[in-house]
């Protein structure tokens, strides 16, 4: 009797928020189970479940659905990063080469046993080059992922490991040469 005849409004923002909240409340192992089919659709096979769970622990709460989360994880699983994208155009590549050279030298000298070691070396590079992190961070993050938006650099390096991190940074250095 008291139902209106007007159409209901479906609020996608609220739905996305609710979905994001639901994802946040799940255990990482459950999210891993749910996300594997989405990764498979992207032609990514997950061989190491612990690796996937470590990646997911960096911040699944940043996205609001599993498809977006899967898309945001692709750089962890691919061997070659495509640097020729819109984010590349946003970087100042003239200043990037000395940053990359210095960070590569620093990373070659250390072991990636702890995130704080990685973080301290990034700070040292900033000091040695008389730059702020906002100048160094985006270049390193882009070198590791091909994107400007990603988890923190020390977390990325720790998950990717020393060899893959150095390989990607050297790859960007070659790309801009």
List PLM regions with ranges.
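Charged/polar, low-hydrophobicity segments characteristic of intrinsically disordered regions
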Residues: 8-14, 170-177
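Short, hydrophobic/amphipathic alpha-helical patches that form generic packing surfaces
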Residues: 17-21, 58-64, 75, 138-145
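Small-residue-rich helix-loop
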Residues: 28-131
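A conserved active-site cap/scaffold subdomain adjacent to cofactor or substrate pockets
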Residues: 1-43
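Charged substrate- and nucleic-acid-binding regions of tRNA-handling and nucleotidyl-transfer enzymes
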Residues: 115-176
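Short alpha-helical linear motifs
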Residues: 18-19, 38, 76-80, 160-166
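Short helix-capping/linker segments at secondary-structure and domain boundaries
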Residues: 24-28, 67, 146-153
């Amino acid at each position: 009797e008291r139902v209106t005849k007007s159409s209901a409004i479906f609020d996608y923002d609220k739905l996305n928020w609710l979905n994001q909240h639901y994802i946040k409340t799940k255990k990482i192992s459950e999210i891993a189970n749910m996300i594997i089919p989405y990764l498979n659709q992207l032609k990514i096979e997950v061989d190491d479940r612990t690796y996937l769970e470590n990646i997911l622990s960096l911040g699944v709460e940043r996205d609001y659905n599993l498809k977006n989360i899967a898309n945001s994880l692709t750089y962890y699983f691919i061997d070659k990063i495509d640097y020729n994208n819109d984010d590349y155009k946003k970087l100042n590549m003239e200043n990037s080469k000395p940053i990359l050279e210095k960070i590569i030298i620093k990373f070659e000298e250390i072991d990636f046993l702890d995130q704080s070691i990685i973080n301290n070396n990034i700070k040292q590079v900033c000091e040695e080059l008389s730059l702020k992190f906002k100048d160094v961070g985006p270049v390193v993050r882009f070198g590791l992922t091909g994107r400007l938006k990603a988890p923190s650099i020390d977390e990325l390096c720790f998950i990717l490991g020393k060899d893959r991190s150095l390989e990607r940074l050297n790859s960007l250095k070659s790309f801009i040469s």
